Swiss-Prot record:
Role according to the record: Essential for fertility (male and female gametophyte functions and development). Required for the integrity of female gametic mitochondria. Involved in embryo apical-basal patterning, and particularly dorsal-ventral patterning, during early embryogenesis, and endosperm free nucleus positioning and development as well as early endosperm development, probably by modulating the expression pattern of related genes (e.g. AL1, MYB3/AL2, CYP78A13/GE, PNH1, HAZ1, MPK6 and OSH1).
Transit peptide: 1-43
Alphabetical UniProt keywords: Developmental protein, Mitochondrion, Transit peptide
Pfam family membership, one: MRP-L20
Coiled coil: none
Main location: mitochondrion
Compartments where found: Mitochondrion
Protein name: Protein GAMETE CELL DEFECTIVE 1, mitochondrial
Keyword Signal attributed: no
GO cellular component, as recorded: mitochondrion
GO biological process: cell communication; embryo development ending in seed dormancy; endosperm cellularization; endosperm development; gametophyte development; mitochondrial membrane organization; nucleus localization; pollen development
Stretch list, region Disordered: 36-82
Domain of life assignment: Eukaryota
Amino acid sequence: MLALRKTLLHGRLPAAPPAAAAAAIASRIPALLRRLSSSPGDGQGGDEWGSSWSTGITKEHFDGSDAAVGRPVTSPSKPVSPELAAVRAMDEEDEIFRAMERDNREAKAYVDSWGDRMRETCELLKQVREPGSRGSYLKDSEKQEMYRLHKEDPETYTVERLAKDFRVMRQRVHAILWLKEMEEEEERKLGKPLDDSVEVLLDSCPEFFNSHDREFHVASLPYKPDFKVMPEGWDGTTRDPDEVLYEISMKEDQMLYEEFVQRLQFNKKKVAGEVKCHKYSRRRPDDGWTYMVEKLGVQSKRGSGGGWKFASLPDGSSRPLNDMEKMYVKRETPKRRRRIMAPFK
C-alpha cells in the first residue's frame, strides 16, 4: 500500500542512482545543509546562525495566524493533483473499512449475547407465570437433613423455619416431611433400607437440574382500570403497585397454605384407613346411622351466621362433633372467594 501511494504521488518509481552519482551527492550534503541553515555575516566567511530562525518561523507562527511547522495547509484555490486525491480517497476508504469492522465486531458481540438474555428473560417470565417453578429440584440429602432436624427438635425447627432456611414453600416442607415419614415406616416394615440409587444419581449430577431459589406465590391481578371517588383534600398520592401486589400475594399464599394443610391432613387419614371411601363402607350399621344436625340461629341463618352443628346418635342422644367430623364439615364448606390459579393456564 505504501509503495502504491508513493507511485501515485511521484507518477513513477524512482530509479536507483549510480555509484558515482551517489558519492557526489553524499559529498555535497554538508555544504548544502550549511548553505540552507546559515548566511554570511560580516563578509569574511563567518556564519550567522541566529538568522537561520527567520527562514522557517515567522511572526505569523507566533500570532497563531499561520499553520504549524510540518503541517501542510492546502488552500481551497490551490489545485490538487490526481495522485494526491487518489491517496486521500484511499485513506478515507481505509478509515471507513476500519469503522465498519469495529461496528461489525460490536454488533456480533451484541447478537451473541442475545442467547443468554433470552434465557434469563424466559426464567423470569416463567417465575412470574408459574410461581415456585424455580425450585423444581431439591436434593435428597437436603430433604433428609430437613426431616432429621424436624424429628430431633420439632419445637425449634418448625415448618415455617425450615421453609425459610431451605428457601422453599411451606407446602413443600409438609410434603417432604410426610414423604420421609412414610419412607422410614416402610424401612421399618422391610427391615432394610430402601433403594436410593436414583436419589444418589440425581444428587451426583446437579448440573442437569435447576437449583431451588426462593419459591413464593405471585398473585395474578386483572389488568383493567380501577376508578374510585377520592375524598376531598386528597393530595394525589397513591400506593406503590408493587407493595399492593406483595400484600395480595401474601394473603393468597396464606389461603393456599391453609387449604393445602387441610387436604394433606385428609389424605393422611385416608392413607391410614380412617376415611372410608369405598361403597361397602357406606352400608347401614346395625345400630343405625349417626346424623349431623345443624341448628339455625336467632335470625334463621346457617353456618357462621348463628347456627351450630352437632351429631345425633341412633339412640336419640346428641354430642359435639369430633375432629374427624369437623374436618369433613370444613371440607364441605364453600369458599366464598374467587378461584386462585396460576396465570396463563
